[in-house]
Structures are given as structure tokens and as C-alpha cells.
Amino acid sequence: MGDPASSSTWVAKKVPSDSEISDNLSWRNVSVSQVQAAPKIYEQNIRLSGSMYDDPLFNYFRDDTDDQWTRTTDFTPSASIGQSYILCLELPHICYLPNIREYFVYYEVHNDIFNLQPGYSYSSNTCFVPVVKSHYFTDVPYEILFKINHLVQNGTLSGPTLDDNFYRLVSPGYERIDRIKRALEKMSYLKKTCLNPTNWLSEQYKKMRRSRVLTSPNITLDDDGLVYVYRVQITPAKVYFYGPEINVSNRVVRNYAADLDNFLRISFVDEDCEKLRSTDLSQRSAPGNNTRRTALYNRVLSVLSNGITIGDKHFDFLAFSSSQLRDNSAWMFASRPGLSASDIREWMGNFRNIRNVAKYAARLGQSFSSSTETLKVHKYEVKEAPDVTNGTEYVFSDGIGTISADFADEVSKKCNLTRFTPSAFQIRYGGYKGVVAIDPTSQWKLSLRKSMSKFQSDNITLDVLAYSKYQPCFLNRQLITLLSTLGVIDSIFELKQQEAVQQLNRMVAEPQAAIDAIELMPMGEITNIVKELLLCGYRPDVEPYVSMLLQTFRASKLLELKTRSRIFVPKGRAMMGCLDETRTLKYGQVFIQASNSADDRGKSVVTGKVIVAKNPCIHPGDIRILQAVHSPLLGHMVNCVVFPQLGPRPHPNECSGSDLDGDIYFVSWDPDLIPTRMVAPMDYTPAPTETLDHDVMIEEVHEYFTNYIVNESLGIIANAHVVFADRQSLKAESTQCIKLAELFSIAVDYPKTGVPAQIPHELHVKEYPDFMEKLDRATYVSEGVIGKLYREIKKQNPHIRHFTKDVATLSYDTDLIVDGYQDYITEAVWFKEEYDFKLGNLMEHYGINSEAEIISGCILKMAKNFTKKSDADAIRLAVKSLRKEARSWFSEMGSDESGDGHKALVAKASAWYHVTYHPQYWGCYNEGYDHRPHLISFPWCVYDKLILIKQKKNIARKMLDLQNRMRRNTILG
């Protein structure tokens, strides 16, 4: 039924309209449910027979095994289901009813009487509900209207209450727009529906006029690489508006920055925010095995074909990146005079010679990859280098070129990299995509190969997507399964997991263990903050900020061990693949030079046997055992795995059919993990593609996107492989697993080829191992290595200590209090309120429970309409931007750090600490947000100032101790 909040059974009396006759007046049993989302709607072809049990009135159980129910959309004429938060269902008197208590947490039986009153549709159209728009005589800006729709869709506002007075109150002609935005933002965190929004807004405006409103409720962005983007989720029965949300920009939105509000990200999800299943869009009937498109298929295709209207803007389909396609997401654009979605596609490049729909769609999406704009490179500064085939059918240089050392330094600076210059960059340049690695001998800024060219484009800006750097590596269930298949014994993995757990347990109690752990497994921007705090004497089990971050880090790693068997491998790295341009490496050899830790202190060349793999990997031949050798000519290559360009077949292609256009490889030189045998790699030659006899039309791209949802089978194949590898004696070498590996390769290539994988009936599974935690399916206790690891890690307790008033009393550090801090208390309280407001909004927006999770990026759980995989970067960037904004508030008083200016800065930092940590301020920033915890990350935005204070106090204490010892020694002497 879709996330029920509560349910009750009532005796209802229907109130007829004047036109109804009195005979219709009747008493009825009804079930009333309050829902947070629309229910999943099913339909059934009615059987015609004389039996009363075939009557639709009595045949209402969806799980009847004799019937096939099909997913459908809102069947009511005015789309009433999608506009309703209370559902009233009439219950037949003479039919057996299920035990409703089993399905609803909050359930009551009432004998009261309530009256059903006629309702009406309040949505501006019935295709997308609920969507409202302002009345024609009231000017409400798009950003305000978007927020109002969000409030209606999450139940904070009731659509029928939005009258002329309401729209007048949210018009810039009545109130300042920053106050309107702030009031609506505050409204979105009310825990119940605001039934009188005009009064509520009026009261909020009065409070704001009396108080100091510092900034917009949105986090300030002063980084050219970040943008705010609006997002819409479309379900079978409803739509949900989100944002604006912080995103890394891409080539397209940077070029059309003035039209940012005309871009929209859409995604298609089910009512419970899970991905749509292929069977929801297309059902296969038994006779003749024919497929039938459902109403959900038509809804997705209709949205892509016809667009979506929000206020005065009509958004049309634009394109989608490869990652968006996997997430069933796409970009849309609202045309304006002189610029349409078609115009933008024309600007992106010339795609007319691409006659395959899947490839055409992929090339359109190439420009939408999140990237950092660097420098312009003129065509005469680019060399066209030949590809390396080595006389074989393979392209050894597939996706890789070179960059000169000097130009690499310039690009690094544009990427804000000051400590090192990466050895390789993943790039987009014009119609080229792939990797460029440093060539110390090259005088050309860029040397690009034909395999990197995907379409024609006049764009000459070099965009960077990623670069080579220190990256820790981890085992996962697929790697463990393959290594186990190849002979690595179970006890090895059990020992590795035990060592990882011991390291996590030590880091929350021992300072040096914590420093070592976060250097090997960094937590992003806050790694240095935690490290500096530990180095200046704070203990990981005492200081609340450090403690909560490390405990959350531990909890997240334990969760990864439990759900993914993600075991840290110290003797290994995740590395970008590159090509040996010197031709010194032989087939079977690789060059590996790795940084020792995240801060790039020292590096070492690996020699000896190594294993190399590329995730995802499910064929035993995907694990390659190679020989790492030292090659002086490749000494400039750091944190890359360099493959030879010699031999019968490229090693990257042997690893899951990979290439060198930016893929990251698992590399380990741990002798315990190197199998005693290696099997032949699988043939990853892609299926032949269909070539059209005409230019690809955008309507064909719409259909391809929709068919992708129908045919996408990677998850099904991967899950089936897990089950068969766990149950079969040959593990991943079993007949079933080898066949699934072949199908998996076809499914991986589907976005490029358009050829779907067809899974035979005998490879479908009905029972799952316990470690997959499929609570709604039949399960068994796994006797394999993954099952053993899973049950062992379940014994660990991911305890996280919370910041309470008692903790505040015990942990308040008087060392951080300096003379003059009182002068900045009032200002510090203002800034603390602002910071907490924005950070709390982020936490609630993404459904993140704790401050430590959002600050560290170690998110344990989030709202179902977001995923860690897709949204982790946006969250990290939002927090980074907020910290940067807070530092700008701190610097408002000036940047003079000498003499009195320095004293003022440390006094201000001291005040920030005091209003956060002192017990008298505990909980005082939550007015109107009683459900929010007391947040403590605010003062650590200026951690460098606080650490200076702490270090000075430490030095003074040491000097005093030294003087006392000398005095005692003098007396004793």
C-alpha cells in the first residue's frame, strides 16, 4: 500500500449530494489509512463466470496465486489517488478480511461515525500530481513555486488551502524573497500538516523583521565547479520535487550557466522510492510467451516524449549520462526564445554519423559527466597519435593518450591540487574521452588517439573527471568468491576480516592507531582536522567531536563488512589503469609505484607477484596474476597500474573486458591473496549492434531509455551468480556461474550495444543465502566463505557515543578559552544558529540521522529517495561548501593576523567554541526544531585557530612543568 502511517477501521456514513436519492444513504464498514506516499496500484483482467467469487467486489486479494495482477497508474478520472494522503476503502461485509494488525504499526478500531464530504482536484494538471501553480494575477518566482510544490507533495501543505491570500504572501511584491525562502525552508521541517499557512507565514515574517537574518537558507557557492540543480522524481502515481541540490557541474551547465534554472534532473522510481522493476513495465504472458507493455511503460515514455510543466516552464527531454541511465534518470531543459533542448544538443557536437541508438545516446551523455573545467587547448597543440594494435584484433591503447609534464602541472593547479601532480587524468576534450598519462618526453600538450574520439566537436576546453591518487583497496564479495574459487582458503579471509575489525576497535581508543587508520583509509576533507586534533593531545575516546567521527567511521566500516564483505587490504591499492608508452614491459608484467598513505609521504615500487582485477568481476578468469617489475623509464608514474602494450591480448581486456578510459583496478601484492592457479580469461567481444538506415531521432532515444528499464538485468544476474557460487561445489566455475558471467557481460554492454541479456528460466533463483538479507524471500544458512564472514561480523556492536549535556559538562576544554572571547559571544551565537540551521536542513533533506555521518561522509542510512552511491558526492560538496561559508563569516572582521588582529581572531574562535560546547548553550539552538540534536561541528570550521590556541597552552604547560622540575632539582641539589 505504500508506506502507511496509520490505519483505522470505522463505521462510515456517506453523505449524499442533493441529486442522490435517499436509498443510497447507508452504513458501511470502511478502512481509513493515512499514507506518506501513493500506494502501488494493480489491475486485473476480470474473469467472466457465474461464480460470485469472480465478482470484483469479492475478488480483491492481490496475492491470489491463480490470478496475474499488473501494475498500473492512477485510474481515477482526476488522479485522486496521487492527490490524497487519506485513503478510505469500503470493506465488503460478508468477505473474510486479513489481519490488518499485521500490516499496520498504528492501527485502531473505532465505532465512531464520520462523514465523507465531496473533494475536488487541486492539481494544475492530472498527468503530474500533485503539482500546483500560482493564480494568474500573482507573480510567484519559479524557485518559490518549486518549493511550494515540494511542501504540498510531502504533506506539509494541503493543496486545497492554497488560496489567493497564500500566493500573495509568497510573492516578492509582498515580502523580501530571502525571507520567503527562509520561511518555506523552515516550514518544510514541520512534523505535521500546516493547515493555516497564511497565518503561519505572517508570524514567521514578523519574527524575521525583528531579528537578524544572515543569509539565504541555501548554502553559498563560490566555487565555479559547483551548481544548484532542481530535481523531480516521477512515480507511477505522483511526482516529488527536490532541491535545489548541490552538484558538480558539467560541460553543458557551465556553458549555459545563465539558464541554470531551466535545467532539471528527473528520475523514475516506484512509490517506495525503489527502482522500477522490469516486470512493472512489461509483463510476459505464458501463452506464446508474448510481452505486454503496461501503463507504467507508457507513463515513462510519455514523460520523455511530452515533457513536464512547472509553472510557466515546460521542460523537454535533453539527454542522459551513462550513470543516469543506470539510475533511470535524465536531464530536461525548459526552452526559451533562442534556446531549446535541440539547440543544446546541436552545440554539444555532431552526432549524425552515429547510426546506433544506444551509442548515439551514450555520446549525447558524454558531455554530462561531472567534471572540472581546466584550460583551453587549441587544435594545433594536440597531436593525433596512432592506436596500438600489436598486429592483433585488440586495441592495446583503447581510451588512453598522453599529456606533457609541464601542461600536467598547469592542469593540476586548475584542479586545486597543490601537493602533487597526478600521473594521469581522466578527461573530456571536444568529442574525445578517456585518460591522458604524463609523457616526460612529449612536447605536445595532448596526444590523443582515434580510440578516444567518439564524435566531432568544436569545444577546445579540457575537462577533468578524475585523476590518479592514493586510493585504498578493499575486497568485496565478488573478489572473495573468485579468489576462493581459485584456491585461497576461507581462513585467510576470516583472518583479514578479524585484522580489519581489530584495527577499527583500536582507532576509537588509541590516538596513534586512529592516526594510522585515517591515513590509510581517509575520510575526505576532515581527515586532516581529526589528525591535527589527535596530534595536539585530544584523545579519540574523550573529545566529543573526534570521538563521534571515529566511532561513526568504525560503524560505517562494520556495516560495509556486514553487507558487502568489504575488507581493507593494506598491501593493495585501487589504481587507474595506464599504458606503457616506453614499450619496456613484457606481456604478463606491470609497473606499480604506490604512495604509502593519503598524504603522499613517500612512495615505493612494488615487485613480485600481484593480482589485478576490475570490478565488477564474476568470471574466474577476471583475476589476473601478473609480475610487478621495476622499470626506471616509468618512474614518473605514481598511483597507477601500468600495463604492457605487448602480447596477444591486453591485460585490461582480460579483466572483465575493461579498457584504459578511466577504469579503476583492484591491485594487491599480498601473498596470502594470490591464488595458486589462474584460468583463461573470458571472451568479452561485444554482441553485434544494429545499424539504422537513417539518422537517429530523439524519439528513438526516448524509447531506448524506456526499454532499458525493461531489459536492465545486471542486478538479477549478479544476485543469481552469488547464489549459485555459494551453493555449487565448483563455486564460480560451475556451469551456471559461467553462463551467468557470459550474460553479465552482455548486460554490461547493453547501454552501448542495445542488445539485452536474456536470462533462461533455469538460472532464476528462489532461495537466497542468509548474508543477502532478503527478508521477503526464502533463505538458507550459507556454508560458504561469505556466510562465515557475515555471521562473524554480526557479533560486532557499532556503538556511537552521543553528545549529551552531561558529556558537554565533562568535555568542555578551558584551554580553548582566551581573553576577550566575551566580546564575540553575541555574534558567535548568530553564526552558530545559521550554521546549525543549514546543516540541520541538509541532514533532514537527505534523511541522515547524525551530525557525524554527514560531516565524515560515512553515512549509515539515508532517506529512500537518495542513495549513497548516487548522492554521496553531492552531500560531501554541500558540507564542504557550508564549512567554507562559515569560514567566510569568520573572516568578515578582516584578515590581519598580526598583533591585535591575531588576538581578535583567536578570541573569536574561542567564542565559537564556547557557544557550542559550554553546557549553558546545550540545546538552545533548536527552537522550532525540537527533534534536532545539539550540533558541535561549528567551531571546527576554524580548527586551525583552535589548534593554535591548544598548542600554545600545551607549550605553556610544558614550560611550566620544566621550570617546576628545574626548581625541584635546584632545591634537591
Residue ranges and their predicted role:
Residues 2-657, 664, 668-973:
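Beta-strand-enriched accessory nucleic-acid recognition/scaffold domains that flank the catalytic cores
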